[in-house]
Amino acid sequence: MARIAGVNIPNHKHTVIGLTAIYGIGRSRARKICEATGIPTDKKVKDLTDPDQDALRKEIEKFLVEGDLRRETTMNIKRLMDLGCYRGVRHRKGLPLRGQRTRTNARTRKGPRKAGVALKK
């Protein structure tokens, strides 16, 4: 297994698909990285030579990936929450941020249903 950006890349997959195991690299960015390094996209990860792996590492270092990207994302959310703006309040309450309805639906963001209180007759 090739280890790039602190992540073990699966050996049996094509290079483009294997690079998507790194947080912050999707299919399109992986394809651009392969083009920039001159590595064929259909080449398997196990067939990469050491110079190929080094070239991939150098190209990936140019992007914000893994821990740094996660840290920046959480800091951005924390900043919104500290500001007390609408988006920050919605983050704090665990509700949708972008204007979706919440009377029904929004179950993913709100979590499982809570049991309602039944009134005595």
UniProtKB/Swiss-Prot annotation:
Q: Which domain of life is it from?
A: Bacteria
Which residues, by range, are in coiled-coil regions? none
Q: What is this protein called?
A: Small ribosomal subunit protein uS13
Picking any one GO biological process from the record gives: translation
The annotated subunit structure for this chain is: Part of the 30S ribosomal subunit. Forms a loose heterodimer with protein S19. Forms two bridges to the 50S subunit in the 70S ribosome.
Tell me the protein family, please. Answer: Belongs to the universal ribosomal protein uS13 family.
Spell out the GO cellular component terms annotated for this protein, sorted alphabetically and separated by semicolons.
cytosol; small ribosomal subunit
